[in-house]
């Protein structure tokens, strides 16, 4: 695995849907074979994965929203790396 480049644009893979699930009280990724429960951090990142923003814009938006979180850049990049490896997202 390798960290995504800052100019790549993440997009949810076909067949995946991101939404808040009241019964689970969290954001989830739904796909034909099941569901992935996401923690709060993953939910905040995936809210910004819209197929238009590049990784740099996502990092900048979250850094601005959560300035008190140390190492947020690396956390975001690592999550996107894992999401890509799990085939939840594609990087364009």
Swiss-Prot record:
Pathway: Cofactor biosynthesis; pyrroloquinoline quinone biosynthesis. Keywords: PQQ biosynthesis. InterPro entries: PQQD (IPR008792), PqqD_bac (IPR022479), PqqD_sf (IPR041881). One of its GO terms (molecular function) is quinone binding. One of its GO terms (biological process) is pyrroloquinoline quinone biosynthetic process. It comes from the Bacteria. Pfam families: PqqD (PF05402). Functions as a PqqA binding protein and presents PqqA to PqqE, in the pyrroloquinoline quinone (PQQ) biosynthetic pathway. Monomer. Interacts with PqqE. Belongs to the PqqD family. This is PqqA binding protein. It comes from Pseudomonas paraeruginosa (strain DSM 24068 / PA7) (Pseudomonas aeruginosa (strain PA7)).
